[in-house]
């Protein structure tokens, strides 16, 4: 049964890929590979949008889709498992027409609805956004501090972080405040993670003291 389900999902993705990529035959691979059904849909969409030079347009449209699906009335009907699939398909078809989305985005949304996979929509959008971020050379970085940073410190921090990037890469910085770390900061840039928080230092000191005494 599991193999049949996977086979079915593969056929759905191939169907979508064929519908949006035609008449282009060769798949354009995204700059990063994302696994799972969401990654497959996003890859097919990325390939088609890249071929048609509509990556940025599709990205904006998907962000709009994400906003619409969060609206209470829409979520109550579109994401409700008890609403008939045919009703969802009609509602989404009307929505994509009203928003004047490109055929690429419209085909994706309609196919997800027809295949009963609307719950995967946020994951597909997230996967596509990740592909676009890497496409632009963006390097995600999050910095967590115990208290807000002043402008001078933030500017200095950005300068230091940018010095670790390669040529052509763009820093995409997110600064968070978490009083529980007590002081210092926690930095995550790309796949690297550095914990310089006072909380962690105290925990290390505590463990060292227990080993001694």
From Swiss-Prot:
Which residues are annotated with the PTM N6-acetyllysine? 54, 60, 70, 73, 100, 158, 162, 172, 176, 192
Q: Which domain of life is it from?
A: Eukaryota
PROSITE patterns for the chain: ATPASE_DELTA
GO biological process terms, alphabetically, are:
proton motive force-driven mitochondrial ATP synthesis
Which positions carry N6-succinyllysine? 90, 100, 158, 162, 199
Task: Say yes or no: keyword Transport present.
Answer: yes
Q: Where is the transit peptide?
A: 1-23
A GO molecular function assigned to this protein is: proton-transporting ATP synthase activity, rotational mechanism
Any Pfam family: OSCP
Which cellular component terms (GO) are annotated to the entry?
Answer: mitochondrial inner membrane; proton-transporting ATP synthase complex
Where would I look for the motif SIFI-degron in this sequence? 5-23
Subcellular location(s) of the protein: Mitochondrion; Mitochondrion inner membrane
In terms of SUPFAM superfamilies, this protein maps to:
N-terminal domain of the delta subunit of the F1F0-ATP synthase (SSF47928)
| Keywords of this entry | Acetylation, ATP synthesis, Hydrogen ion transport, Ion transport, Membrane, Mitochondrion, Mitochondrion inner membrane, Transit peptide, Transport, Ubl conjugation
Q: How is it modified after translation?
A: Acetylation at Lys-162 decreases ATP production. Deacetylated by SIRT3. In response to mitochondrial stress, the precursor protein is ubiquitinated by the SIFI complex in the cytoplasm before mitochondrial import, leading to its degradation. Within the SIFI complex, UBR4 initiates ubiquitin chain that are further elongated or branched by KCMF1.
Per UniProt, subunit arrangement is:
Component of the ATP synthase complex composed at least of ATP5F1A/subunit alpha, ATP5F1B/subunit beta, ATP5MC1/subunit c (homooctomer), MT-ATP6/subunit a, MT-ATP8/subunit 8, ATP5ME/subunit e, ATP5MF/subunit f, ATP5MG/subunit g, ATP5MK/subunit k, ATP5MJ/subunit j, ATP5F1C/subunit gamma, ATP5F1D/subunit delta, ATP5F1E/subunit epsilon, ATP5PF/subunit F6, ATP5PB/subunit b, ATP5PD/subunit d, ATP5PO/subunit OSCP.
Family affiliation = Belongs to the ATPase delta chain family.
Q: What does this protein do?
A: Subunit OSCP, of the mitochondrial membrane ATP synthase complex (F(1)F(0) ATP synthase or Complex V) that produces ATP from ADP in the presence of a proton gradient across the membrane which is generated by electron transport complexes of the respiratory chain. ATP synthase complex consist of a soluble F(1) head domain - the catalytic core - and a membrane F(1) domain - the membrane proton channel. These two domains are linked by a central stalk rotating inside the F(1) region and a stationary peripheral stalk.
Its name, as the record gives it, is ATP synthase peripheral stalk subunit OSCP, mitochondrial
**Which species is this UniProt entry from?**
Sus scrofa
